[in-house]
Structures are given as C-alpha cells and as structure tokens.
C-alpha cells in the first residue's frame, strides 16, 4: 500500500496533560476534577487511611520520556481536603537529541494538605530533562514534597556522561517565597565527582515539609540509622523543614526519606504515616 508523502507513520513526541482537583465533602476528600490529554492519567482513587485522605497514583503508560515530550500536570486541593499523589514506578528520561519537559503546578487552599510523593526519576546519559515546579500555598495549607533523582544507570555500567538535568522549584505561601531552587547538572561535569558537588554519588534526594519542629525531633531524625551508604541531614528554615541526602542507589535514598517522613508527618501534618501499597510492588 502506498501512503501519501505527508502521512505520519508515528508520533515523534507526546504532549500529555493531567488536571486534578480535590474537595472536602463532610468528612471525606473526593476528586472534583480529573481531566487528561494524551498518555497521562490517574488510577482509581484510594482511601488507605480512611475517607479524609484521597490517594491517587499518577500513571504515564509509555513508561519513559523522550526528546520533544512534554508533560503538564496541575492539581488543586480545595479547602480542608487532603490529597496524596504518588506513582507506580520510576520516571525514566531517555537519551534524546532534543529537550523533554515536565511542568508541575500545585495549588493548596487554606486548611488543605498535599503530599507529592513520586518514586524516583532516572535520568539516562544523553537525556535532556527540563523540569519546572511551582507550588502555591494559601493560608495555613500544608505541604509534603519530595524528589529523588538518579543520574545514569550505574548497575548497567552507564555513567551520566552527556546531556543535562535542569530543575526549577518555587514554593510560595500567599505570594511570599518559601523556597527557590535552580539546578543544572551537565553530564560529565567535574562537580559530579567533586566533594563540593555530588562527591561521586549518583543519587540525590530532597524532602520539604511545611511547618516547624522542635530541636529534639530534628535530632531524633538525624540519629536514625541510614541505609549504607547514605549521607543526609535536616535543616529547619522559617516555616519549612528541609531534608537532603546523597546515595549510590535510589532505593537507599528513598528508604531514608520514608524514615524521615514517618517521623515528621505526625508532628507537621497531624497524621501517622501509612506507607502506600504501590511502593511495595
């Protein structure tokens, strides 16, 4: 069969969108908005902790992000609602000749809580990953946000020798900046092995929790046994607790973050931690 010259045999890149919303109805958090375009969606909402906390698992069926792809995710948590968003597995950014993009917009209304707890991001050598995250908190809204990034695939003998990983994160409360961070990591750069950079570690992770805790609780978190060899620490900033670590494997970094999350969640968010089942599959 002869096809016209202008017939596309495949789509070279994806532009996917996901828009989520949550509201509080009586004593239950329910989805109020769920719109998707392209290969980005959520599974059925879950209530592992009871009706107050609505859990959604964000799924990207292609399994990886390639050059030219763009993922746009937005979520709004209405007043007094509680949403927990996670993922079924690692997000993979493949080697590519052109950049790929992810834009994340999160809005949390007064009295509401949002937990953004995806599994790790794996950035292949020669990938060109560019991520932008903007989080707006209103009134006394609460946030738990983490990010685990693995550069290259050391288990397969692949170092992050070429390409780049670029990340931009802003968190504001009622328009006032709480956290601003820009990262640009170049494949093969000397900072990957430098003591003032990643010091030879291939995984770095950050946990951000709104609120303030006692010095005793911070010390208790610091004294937790770490998966070897993880190097991590915590800092109390005005209105924000920051936990960061370096590791050789994403599994170890995530295990450390989960420990910190279990310790801090009751104090800062007001509920005991319940590990999502999807993390164990």
Swiss-Prot record:
Subcellular location: Cytoplasm
Domain of life from the UniProt record: Bacteria
First-listed, main subcellular location of the protein, grouped into a coarse class: cytoplasm
Any Gene Ontology CC annotation: cytoplasm
Protein name: Urease accessory protein UreD
Family to which this protein belongs: Belongs to the UreD family.
Gene Ontology molecular functions: nickel cation binding
Keyword Ribonucleoprotein: no
Coiled coil (residue ranges): none
InterPro entries: UreD
Gene: ureD
Source species of the chain: Pseudomonas savastanoi pv. phaseolicola (strain 1448A / Race 6) (Pseudomonas syringae pv. phaseolicola (strain 1448A / Race 6))
Assembly, per entry: UreD, UreF and UreG form a complex that acts as a GTP-hydrolysis-dependent molecular chaperone, activating the urease apoprotein by helping to assemble the nickel containing metallocenter of UreC. The UreE protein probably delivers the nickel.
Alphabetical keyword list: Chaperone, Cytoplasm, Nickel insertion
Function summary: Required for maturation of urease via the functional incorporation of the urease nickel metallocenter.
